[in-house]
C-alpha cells in the first residue's frame, strides 16, 4: 500500500514538473541561450551603436524582459516589436546590424538624425517590413540589394544622404512599393525601371537613363595626343582664343535675353494677378498655399465653421473651380516637423477606398498644418441620429444596416488591405460621414498617429472618446486592430439606439453607459426597448437580435475574444442580404427615447462632434 502511494506521488510530481517545464519553454521562446529576450538584445545593440546626446534612449534597459514599454517602441498584441519610430531625435553613430534580428518589424522610422556609415544589408531579413524611412541622415556606401527581398515593403525613403553607386535592380523592381524616394544622394549609373507608383530621384547628378532625363553614353573620353609643332601649336592657341571670345559674347547675349525675359514674365504675372505661394503636389495630393486656404474659407470666418474637436477646427471652403471642401486646421502644429508631417500625409493619402474619406490635399507652413477633404453634404451619422435635419430623409432600418456594412468595409481595408496598415483609434458615429447617396465614409483615420509625433512612444497618448475606447487601450496605451473592432461594436449600438455611448435620460431606465444597458436588455430578451424610437417600430426582429449579438461580441472586454473586422464584415453582408429581401412593416415596437442631457467626455482630447458635415 505504501509503495503504491509512493508511486502515485512520484507520478504526480513528474507530471507537474514537465507541465511547468512546458510552460517555461513557451515563455522562453523569445529568449536567447543566455536567458535574455532576443529583441531586447537586438535593441540594446542598436542603442549601443548610437550616440544619444538627448538621452532619449535612457529608458532602454538590458535587464528588462519586455521592450514594449520603452520609448519609441511599438509592439503587437502578441508582444513582438513591430515598430521603431525614432525620427528627429538627434541620434548619431551607426545603425547596428542587429536591426535585422527584429524580424517582426513593420515600421522603421529613423529620418532626420545624424547617422553615418553604411545601411546594414541585414535590413533585408525584415520580411514583414512595410515602411522604411532613413532620409535626412549621412548614410554612405551603396544601397543594399537585400532591400529588394522585402516583398511587403510599401514605403521607402532614403533621400538626403550620401549614398553612392547604382540603384539596385531588385530595389527598383519591388512590385509592392507605392512610394520610393532616392533624391539628393550621389547615386550614379543607369537608372533601372522603377515599379513604384510614385518615386523621386532628383538631385543625383550622375544618374542617367529615361527616369533621370539624362542620356547614358558609352563613349570614353578621348586623350590628347596631337603632337603639334610649335607653329601649328600657335595657330591652335589662336583658334582657342577666338573660340573662347565667341563663347563669352554668346554668354553675355544670353544673359541679356534672360534678363528681358524675366521682366516680361513678371509683368505677365502681374497682369494676370497670379500671386500664389510656392506649391507642389505629392502624388495625387495637392499642396495648397496658406493664401488659397484663407480665400477659400473667407479668412477662416466663423460662419464657415463646421465643427471643433480634439484634432482642431473644421471649416467649409470654396475653391476657385467651385469645388466645396472641408478644411481641418490641426491643433499644435509646432509639435509636428515639416518632414514628419509630409511623410504621414503621404501615408494617409495612399489609403484610397470608396468607404474612406479621400485626402484631397494639405497646407503646411511653419505655423500651420491643415488637411483638405471633400465636403460631405449629408454630415455624419451622429448628426443624422441626433440633430434635426428638417425635410431631409432620416435613417431607416435598412439604411442603418447599410451604413454599418460600409463602415466595416472601410475598416477592413485599413486593417488588412492598406499598406502600411492603419489603426483608426476613434471609431464612432461622429467619424462616419455620409456622401450624397448616404453611403458610409470613414473619416479621421490616421490623424491620431499624426498628432502623436509630440510623444516619444508610438502609443503613449490615448486618443479617442470615453465610452468608445477599448479597455486595453485605455489602461495600457497599446492599440491594435481589435481596438477598432471595439469602437465598431459601439457604433452598431449607436445606430440601433440612436444614443451616444455615454447618455443619461429620465425614462424608466436611467442610462449611463449604453453598453451595460443593452447587455441587460439583451439578457432579458427585451430587444425592442433598445431600438431608436425614430424608427417607429419598422425594423426586422431577427436581424436586430443578430446585430445586437454582433455588437456585444465586438465589445468583449478582452481583445482576443473579439472577431477581426473581416469576420464582422462577412456577418454584416449576410444580414444586408436579409434586409434587402424586404420585411413587412410591424406594429410599432415599444421603445423609449431619452434626452441627450450630457455631452460625451473625451480622454486627453475632446470628442469631435460636428454640427455640420466635415
From Swiss-Prot:
Membrane topology, record value: Single-pass type I membrane protein
Regions that span the bilayer: 243-263
EC number: 2.7.11.1
Subcellular location per the Swiss-Prot or TrEMBL entry: Membrane
Ranges in coiled-coil conformation: none
Extracellular side: 27-242
GO biological process: anther development; homeostasis of number of meristem cells
Residues the record lists as Phosphothreonine modifications: 297, 323, 459-460, 465, 476, 555
Group of enzyme by EC: transferase
Keyword set, alphabetical order: ATP-binding, Glycoprotein, Kinase, Leucine-rich repeat, Membrane, Nucleotide-binding, Phosphoprotein, Receptor, Repeat, Serine/threonine-protein kinase, Signal, Transferase, Transmembrane, Transmembrane helix
One Gene Ontology MF term: coreceptor activity
Keyword Protein biosynthesis: no
Family membership: Belongs to the protein kinase superfamily. Ser/Thr protein kinase family.
PANTHER family named in the record: LEUCINE-RICH REPEAT-CONTAINING PROTEIN DDB_G0281931-RELATED (PTHR48006), PROTEIN KINASE DOMAIN-CONTAINING PROTEIN (PTHR48006:SF90)
Designated name of the protein: Probable LRR receptor-like serine/threonine-protein kinase At5g45780
Species for this entry: Arabidopsis thaliana (Mouse-ear cress)
Amino acid at each position: 500500500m505504501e509503495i503504491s502511494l509512493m508511486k502515485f506521488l512520484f507520478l504526480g510530481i513528474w507530471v507537474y514538473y514537465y507541465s511547468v517545464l512546458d510552460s517555461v519553454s513557451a515563455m522562453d521562446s523569445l529568449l536567447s541561450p543566455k536567458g535574455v529576450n532576443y529583441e531586447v538584445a537586438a535593441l540594446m545593440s542598436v542603442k549601443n551603436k548610437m550616440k544619444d546626446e538627448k538621452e532619449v534612449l535612457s529608458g532602454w534597459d538590458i535587464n528588462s524582459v519586455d521592450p514594449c514599454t520603452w520609448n519609441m517602441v511599438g509592439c503587437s498584441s502578441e508582444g513582438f516589436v513591430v515598430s521603431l519610430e525614432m525620427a528627429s531625435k538627434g541620434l548619431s553613430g551607426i545603425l547596428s546590424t542587429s536591426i535585422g534580428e527584429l524580424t517582426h518589424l513593420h515600421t522603421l522610422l529613423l529620418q532626420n538624425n545624424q547617422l553615418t556609415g553604411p545601411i546594414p544589408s541585414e535590413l533585408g531579413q525584415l520580411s514583414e517590413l512595410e515602411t522604411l524611412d532613413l532620409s535626412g541622415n549621412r548614410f554612405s556606401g551603396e544601397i543594399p540589394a537585400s532591400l529588394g527581398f522585402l516583398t511587403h515593403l510599401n514605403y521607402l525613403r532614403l533621400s538626403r544622404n550620401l549614398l553612392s553607386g547604382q540603384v539596385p535592380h531588385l530595389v527598383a523592381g519591388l512590385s509592392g512599393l507605392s512610394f520610393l524616394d532616392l533624391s539628393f544622394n550621389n547615386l550614379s549609373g543607369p537608372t533601372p525601371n522603377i515599379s513604384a507608383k510614385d518615386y523621386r530621384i532628383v538631385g543625383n547628378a550622375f544618374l542617367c537613363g529615361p527616369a533621370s532625363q539624362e542620356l547614358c553614353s558609352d563613349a570614353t573620353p578621348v586623350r590628347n595626343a596631337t603632337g603639334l609643332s610649335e607653329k601649328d601649336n600657335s595657330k591652335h592657341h589662336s583658334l582657342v582664343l577666338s573660340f573662347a571670345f565667341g563663347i563669352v559674347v554668346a554668354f553675355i547675349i544670353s544673359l541679356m535675353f534672360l534678363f528681358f525675359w524675366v521682366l516680361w514674365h513678371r509683368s505677365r504675372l502681374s497682369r494676370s494677378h497670379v500671386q500664389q505661394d510656392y506649391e507642389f503636389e505629392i502624388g495625387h495630393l495637392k499642396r495648397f498655399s496658406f493664401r488659397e486656404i484663407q480665400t477659400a474659407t473667407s479668412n477662416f470666418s466663423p460662419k464657415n465653421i463646421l465643427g471643433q474637436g480634439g484634432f482642431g477646427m473644421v471649416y467649409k471652403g470654396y475653391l476657385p473651380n467651385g469645388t466645396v471642401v472641408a478644411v481641418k486646421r490641426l491643433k499644435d502644429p509646432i509639435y509636428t516637423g515639416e518632414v514628419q508631417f509630409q511623410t504621414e500625409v503621404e501615408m494617409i493619402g495612399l489609403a484610397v477606398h470608396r468607404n474612406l474619406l479621400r485626402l484631397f490635399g494639405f497646407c503646411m507652413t511653419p505655423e500651420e498644418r491643415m488637411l483638405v477633404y471633400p465636403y460631405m453634404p449629408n454630415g455624419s451619422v451622429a448628426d443624422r441620429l441626433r440633430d434635426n435635419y428638417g425635410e431631409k430623409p432620416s435613417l431607416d432600418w435598412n439604411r442603418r444596416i447599410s451604413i454599418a456594412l460600409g463602415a466595416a468595409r472601410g475598416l477592413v481595408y485599413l486593417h488588412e488591405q492598406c499598406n502600411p496598415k492603419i489603426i483608426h483609434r476613434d471609431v464612432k458615429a461622429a467619424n462616419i460621414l455620409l456622401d450624397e447617396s448616404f453611403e458610409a465614409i470613414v473619416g479621421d483615420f490616421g490623424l491620431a498617429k499624426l498628432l502623436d509625433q509630440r510623444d516619444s512612444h508610438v502609443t503613449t497618448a490615448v486618443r479617442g472618446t470615453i465610452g468608445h475606447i477599448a479597455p486595453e487601450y485605455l489602461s495600457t496605451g497599446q492599440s491594435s486592430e481589435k481596438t477598432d473592432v471595439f469602437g465598431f461594436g459601439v457604433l452598431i449600438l449607436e445606430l440601433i439606439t440612436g444614443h451616444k455611448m455615454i447618455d443619461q435620460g429620465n425614462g424608466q431606465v436611467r442610462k449611463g453607459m449604453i453598453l451595460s444597458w443593452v447587455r441587460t436588455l439583451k439578457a432579458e430578451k427585451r430587444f425592442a426597448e433598445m431600438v431608436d424610437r425614430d424608427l417607429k417600430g419598422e425594423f426586422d426582429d431577427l436581424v436586430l437580435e443578430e446585430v445586437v449579438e454582433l455588437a456585444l461580441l465586438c465589445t468583449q472586454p478582452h481583445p482576443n475574444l473579439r472577431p477581426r473586422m473581416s469576420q464582422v464584415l462577412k456577418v454584416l453582408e449576410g444580414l444586408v442580404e436579409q434586409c434587402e429581401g424586404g420585411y413587412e412593416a410591424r406594429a410599432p415596437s415599444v421603445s423609449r427615447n431619452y434626452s441627450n442631457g450630457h455631452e460625451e467626455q473625451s480622454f486627453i482630447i475632446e470628442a469631435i462632434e460636428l454640427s455640420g458635415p466635415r
